[in-house]
Amino acid sequence: MGLLSDVINNFLPETPLAWAALILASFTLYSVQLVVRRLYFHPLSKIPGPFLARSRYWYEFYQDIILGGIYVKNYAALHEKYGPVLRASPDRVHVSDPDFFHEVYSSGSKYMKDPAFFQAAGGIPEALPAIVDVEYHRRRRKLINDLFSAKSMEALSHLVLKVVQNALSKAHEHHEANKVLDIQRLYTGITIDTIMQVLCDRTLNFIDAKEEEEPPFLATLRTFSENFFLLKHFPILIWMALNIPKSIAQKLIPGEFEFRASINQWIRDRASEHELGVEKAEDGRKTVIDLLLRPEDGGRPLTHQAVEDETYSFAFAGTHTTSHTMSMGTYYLLSHPAKLQKLRDELKPIPKNDQGLYEYKTVRSLPYLNACIKESLRMSSPVPGILPRLVPAEGMTWRGHYLPPGTSVSSSIYSVHTDPNIFPNPEQFIPERWLANENLDHYLVVFGKGSRACIGLNVAWMETYLTFSNFFTSLNMTLFETNEQSTDWTDCGNAMIKKHVRVKVDSLAS
């Protein structure tokens, strides 16, 4: 024992400087072996990519956080240099190939969601977008699927039209007061007040809120978007935020606790109404919360946490994505007067209702309106980044590169939407491309594909049909301090532009 002690004492450094040298040497050796292993002995060692991306996670961290969410924009240049199959980080592969997108994300795909991404960044593990297990996801989605069918949209359309009418009134007020209109915030009001009707048959009256106010919901949405990649790289921050003293957490994530409290109150209110035998909205509709509390298939109700997570998720997913698309569509159309006039000409002969508004059933099939919306969706790509999946047990080979089981793979929506082989001049707003080639619909992947596609896509389409048709024929607008620079976006889970789209309502259209 004494001999062993002497050996240890002789080996250990005797001074602080020697200790520092030992620690530095150990760290250096560890780092070198880690880099060597990832470059030459890793299952993905033969996949091409930048040296730093293949060897260190810090490369992705740098793109996501230091440079502010621009990795998805840099994929094109990297793929041009390294080929269609790119090692974007030590354990993740990005593929720039629209056919690969459909291979991975379409119905019947064996590629499961990557839990390291979907379970980590959102903090809502029981919400549909975060559920990894395919069968559990199928059962959960089935509970509410009928609410989002085309038939259900007809029943909901009169409520959405009322919301749009209220927003138009707000735009009229800005015209009369000669005030600049933050139309992106107004569109956000349309989407929030609509999704609240779907969730729990109520409205937050966001359209009527003062522009200088930031309600708890918006504060939460902004904070989450600004910190999306920080939470992705350091998911422990979510746990910390939810477990530190409330007084501190409220400063770090403003609005979060107030919004969560509102959600819980909505759930309790609906549960109380169920106990009194009231299980539908006043107009006979069932809401998302209704069906989650009392499934129509006779199954067990979800836990309170699951209902809360689902409600939270719907509120987020159903708000920014659509308002961003409508805002950017407004920017594109106001920047192209001839195309805006073409849209107005198509709408002019369409009959309006007694309130002088276009209805969903009369405009949803108009070719040029659809083309304008599709082009707005393509160019704005509200969720532009990666949605990783895991290669199934049998592995796969793509473009000569073998990807072993469990590899995290992705193909970003933005990469598909800007592929010049499919969309010539992808940076230009050309609605006519959708009229000339019906096959392009296959490559409009903004809502995803298959059983994992966005469940609320019909709601988003309806909101946009009603907003575009009524706003562009009721108002004459010009852009205010909104241009290519102000609408430049970064990936924050959602696409976030530098400044909101703002307009002046010059006159009311006759």
Swiss-Prot record:
Recorded metabolic or biological pathway in which this protein acts: Secondary metabolite biosynthesis
Subcellular location: Membrane
Broadest EC class assigned to this enzyme: oxidoreductase
Function: Cytochrome P450 monooxygenase; part of the gene cluster that mediates the biosynthesis of botrydial. Botrydial is necessary for colonization of plant tissue by the T4 strain. It is a strain-dependent virulence factor since highly aggressive strains like SAS56 or B05 still retain substantial virulence when botrydial synthesis is impaired, since they produce also botcinic acid. The first step of botrydial biosynthesis is performed by the sesquiterpene synthase BOT2 which catalyzes the cyclization of farnesyl diphosphate (FPP) to presilphiperfolan-8-beta-ol (PSP).
EC identifiers of the protein: 1.-.-.-
Upregulation: The botrydial biosynthesis cluster genes are co-regulated by the Ca(2+)/calcineurin signal transduction pathway, which is under the control of the alpha subunit BCG1 of a heterotrimeric G protein. Expression of the cluster is also positively regulated by the cluster-specific transcription factor BOT6.
Protein name, as recorded: Cytochrome P450 monooxygenase BOT1
Sample GO molecular function, one term: monooxygenase activity
Organism this protein belongs to: Botryotinia fuckeliana (Noble rot fungus)
Assigned protein family: Belongs to the cytochrome P450 family.
Entry-linked CDD domains: CYP58-like
Disruption phenotype: Abolishes the production of 10-beta,15-alpha-dihydroxyprobotryane, botrydial, and of some of its relatives.
Membrane-crossing segments per the record: 16-36
InterPro entries from the UniProt entry: Cyt_P450, Cyt_P450_CS, Cyt_P450_E_grp-I, Cyt_P450_sf, Cytochrome_P450_monoxygenase
Glycosylation sites recorded in the entry for this protein: N476
Residues where heme binds: C454
SUPFAM superfamilies assigned to the protein according to its UniProt record, in alphabetical order: Cytochrome P450
Gene Ontology CC: one annotated term: membrane
Membrane topology of this protein: Single-pass membrane protein
Entry annotated with the keyword Heme: yes
Cofactor(s) listed in the protein's UniProt record: heme
Keyword annotations: Glycoprotein, Heme, Iron, Membrane, Metal-binding, Monooxygenase, Oxidoreductase, Transmembrane, Transmembrane helix, Virulence
